[in-house]
Swiss-Prot record:
GO biological process entries: cellular response to estrogen stimulus; estrogen receptor signaling pathway; left/right axis specification; regulation of transcription by RNA polymerase II
Region entry Hinge, spans: 246-302
Compositionally biased tracts (Basic residues): 252-264
A Gene Ontology molecular function term of the record: zinc ion binding
Pfam families on file: Hormone_recep, Oest_recep, zf-C4
Protein name, UniProt field: Estrogen receptor
Oligomer and partners: Binds DNA as a homodimer. Can form a heterodimer with ER-beta.
One Gene Ontology term, aspect cellular component: chromatin
Domain NR LBD, chain residue ranges per copy: 303-539
Zinc as UniProt keyword: yes
Domain remarks in the Swiss-Prot or TrEMBL record: Composed of three domains: a modulating N-terminal domain, a DNA-binding domain and a C-terminal ligand-binding domain.
Residues spanning the signal sequence: none
Family from the record: Belongs to the nuclear hormone receptor family. NR3 subfamily.
Length: 586
């Protein structure tokens, strides 16, 4: 059988037949088939059947379960100028970023929905095209449209979450949320005694380390919260103190081994009357090795309240003047009144000093030495304290108030008078309290003879270390009272410094008063009593210009004998019984 030779007409006719067959295939009714595996998720619409055409000419129909599908009318086939693809095809998106297939068209990025398996089981699947071929793949999680790096991060988070679910609960899940006690922001930790945020912690640290003279522009009642905490520094600092912030604040539930050891040592120290130098060093007190065999004062076992109470009970009684208000004051009469008052107050001052806690534990030599160095300073600070309630006047006694004009009758007294009135004004401005006054007076007694410079005839102290220990105890009591009064830490430090600075002015006034009193003695203006005269001789100031005069006076005056370092006029105030008791305790 011979085949006819193909010609151009026959080829064209054959091509038309193929195209007609393809068009017939496209227009035939869709054939429903069952797949071995269900297809994946597709974006469907209006709960209709979605028709998908394949190059083989077979059409598959998938019914969506209560999910919208594309209608057949919405799908179109655009003729391609190239085989299996054209640049004119739009709206086609594949999952593996390959050239789009000319068969499947989607209007926008699909959000896949699960199809119903032919057995009724709902399993997600999706279609994948590879160079014109199609395969049914198992659908990935809804985030499979992300990039590969996002997929890796997502899978890593899923593995971490699954591991956390299997393991014990994490610290973040069990950590209790704390809020700042000042501004109610999230607290970063326990700072300065309260739960606070980093901002309030840093603000309080700056305030206690530097200057905090903040002024509120309003009424000191500004609202301090997370948003308005920076609006008013004064009110913010006030609230920090109100909620309990303090320097060195620690959590009470954090008690490490070091704190427990310190507490145990403190309890052992309170049970013992004998304190060794190592325990004194823990209290920040340096002790000489020569103190090892010394029995220290029981004042160390006293609390601040007990020490204040003992000092209040030791206060001397009120001394009245013999002044007759009907008679005018002259230089001689005024000096007689003042020296008489001073002599009687000296007796009470010695009794007061012996009742100061720890003073009688010193040697007799040191007791006399301290009294001879501090007697005029103690009398002057008592005069200043009595004059606080009388502005512009000095209250030498309840019945003897003198102003500046009355002090002019005595030569050289006006300068000392003005300094005393100025110091009384300073006490009044500071609103000095009685507890602070008695502590200051005790500090003057114990501190005056530590650095002797008024007389070259006085010997050095014997129990300097013990004097420092008692002095530190009284200073600690003063600080404790300031803290108890409600002052902030910076206010306590400032007030303590101001009070201690006043002591130097009192020392200066004492030196001026000693010079004036000694000049009155040399002029024989007024007779001095034995006790006052002895105290004055102990404070004679030696200068180059009057050194020869002083030596002549010393040669004319008979030598004074002392017993155990006590001056003759002070010996009646230290009986033999007291001397024996003092020596037994040292």
């Amino acid at each position: 059988m011979t085949m006819p030779l193909p010609n151009k007409t026959t080829g064209v006719t054959f091509l038309h037949q193929i195209q007609s067959s393809e068009l017939e295939t496209l227009t035939r009714p869709p054939l429903k088939i069952s797949l071995e595996r269900p297809l994946g998720e597709m974006y469907v619409e209006n709960n209709r059947t979605g028709i998908f055409n394949y190059p083989e000419g077979t059409t598959y129909d998938f019914a969506a379960a209560a999910a919208p599908v594309y209608s057949s009318a919405s799908l179109s086939y655009a003729a391609s100028s190239e085989t299996f693809g054209s640049s004119s095809l739009t709206g086609l998106h594949t999952l593996n970023n390959v050239p789009p297939s000319p068969v499947v068209f989607l209007a926008k990025l699909p959000q896949l929905s699960p199809f119903i398996h032919h057995h009724g089981q709902q399993v997600p699947y999706y279609l994948e095209s590879e160079q014109g071929t199609f395969a049914v793949r198992e659908a990935a999680p809804p985030t499979f449209y992300r990039s590969s790096s996002d997929n890796r991060r997502q899978s890593g988070r899923e593995r971490m979450s699954s591991a956390n679910d299997k393991g014990p609960p994490s610290m973040e899940s069990t950590k209790e949320t704390r809020y700042c006690a000042v501004c109610s922001d999230y607290a970063s930790g326990y700072h300065y005694g309260v739960w606070s945020c980093e901002g309030c912690k840093a603000f309080f640290k700056r305030s206690i380390q530097g200057h905090n003279d903040y002024m509120c522009p309003a009424t000191n009642q500004c609202t301090i919260d997370k948003n308005r905490r920076k609006s008013c520094q004064a009110c913010r600092l006030r609230k920090c103190y109100e909620v309990g912030m303090m320097k060195g604040g620690i959590r009470k539930d954090r008690r490490g081994g070091r704190l427990l050891k310190h507490k145990r040592q403190k309890e052992e120290q309170e049970q013992k009357n004998d304190v060794d130098p190592s325990e004194i060093r823990t209290a920040s007190i340096w002790v000489n090795p020569s103190v090892k065999s010394m029995k220290l004062s029981p004042v160390l076992s006293l609390t601040a309240e007990q020490l204040i109470s003992a000092l209040m009970e030791a206060e001397a009684p009120i001394v009245y003047s013999e002044h007759d208000s009907t008679k005018p004051l002259s230089e001689a009469s005024m000096m007689t009144l003042l020296t008489n008052l001073a002599d009687r107050e000296l007796v009470h001052m010695i009794n007061w000093a012996k009742r100061v806690p720890g003073f009688v534990d010193l040697t007799l030599h040191d007791q006399v030495h301290l009294l001879e160095c501090a007697w005029l300073e103690i009398l002057m600070v008592g005069l200043i304290w009595r004059s606080v309630e009388h502005p512009g006047k000095l209250s030498f006694a309840p019945n003897l108030l003198l102003d500046r004009n009355q002090g002019r009758c005595v030569e050289g007294l006006v300068e000392i008078f003005d300094m005393l009135v100025t110091t009384a004004t300073r006490f009044r401005m500071m609103r000095l309290r009685g507890e602070e006054f008695i502590c200051l007076k005790s500090i003057i007694l114990l501190n005056s003879g530590v650095y002797t410079f008024l007389s070259s005839t006085l010997e050095s102290l014997e129990d300097t270390d013990l004097i420092h220990i008692i002095l530190d105890k009284i200073i600690d009591t003063l600080v404790h009272f300031m803290a108890k009064s409600g002052l902030s830490l910076q206010q306590q430090q400032r007030r303590l410094a101001q009070l201690l600075l006043i002591l130097s002015h009192i020392r200066h006034m004492s030196n001026k008063g000693m010079e004036h009193l000694y000049s009155m003695k040399c002029k024989n203006v007024v007779p001095l009593y034995d006790l006052l005269l002895e105290m004055l001789d102990a404070h004679r100031i030696h200068t180059p210009k009057d050194k020869t005069t002083t030596q002549e006076e010393d040669s004319r005056s008979p030598p004074t004998t002392t017993v155990n370092g006590a001056s003759p006029c002070l010996q009646p105030y230290y009986t033999n019984t007291e001397e024996v008791s003092l020596q037994s305790t040292v």
